[in-house]
Amino acid sequence: MTRARLQKPEEYARSAMKAIAANVQTIADEIDYVEVNSLINDLESAHQNKKRVFVMGAGRSGLVARGFAMRLMHLGLNVYVVGETVTPAVETDDLLIVISGSGETKSINEMGALAKAKGTRLASVTSNKDSTLGTISDTAVIVKGRTKVSGMDFMERQVIGSHISFAPLGTMFEISTMVFLDGVIAALMEITKKSEDDLKKKHATLE
């Protein structure tokens, strides 16, 4: 049986956009800016002291991490994406930034714990402050979005092809995190007195 549509397709799209925008506004109003300042200070310190920054995430959170890494590179930071073949090993005083909605992806948490054991500072963006990731992080910025945690982590769901209907909640977290991290970039631009023209000079010429 075909389910009757309550809205036209374009109305679904409009409603989704409004819901996402409202979620971003709520997060901007409610986010813990003590943790935000801690993350910004970590990045400012890495920039001033020429320390390395590593970013990491799985799935769509990984794509958000890559976009953030690109902007950090534009600002002149020494940044790497975990998982790339050219990414070096983490060392003492490096900064690792992890993005995970659930905060319970096993592979992500294992790498985070390994980095901490090497003396790396760990910062995270997650929607679950009581998660494993949130607990082990030196700085944990909570971005509300995904509130339910599956018994399987991200990698396990991909292997068996299980796509539980967390997509809307996941989307809320990922988009809100992307907007939040762009806000962090704006703050770093102000701190470092970098303009958009300065960032353009660092933009890739081989694409």
PLM feature spans:
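Generic N-terminal amphipathic, Lys/Arg-enriched alpha-helix
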Residues: 1-30
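A short, charged, Gly/Pro-tolerant segment at domain boundaries
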Residues: 11, 183, 189-207
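Conserved active-site and cofactor/substrate-binding residues in soluble primary-metabolism enzymes
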Residues: 11, 15, 19, 34, ...
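Short, glycine-rich nucleotide/cofactor-binding loops
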Residues: 25-32, 98-104
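A short, well-structured juxtamembrane/interface segment
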Residues: 31-47
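Glycine-rich phosphate/diphosphate-binding loops and the adjacent beta-loop-alpha structural elements
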Residues: 45-58, 206
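Glycine-rich phosphate-binding loops that contact phosphosugars or nucleotide phosphates
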Residues: 52-58, 62-176
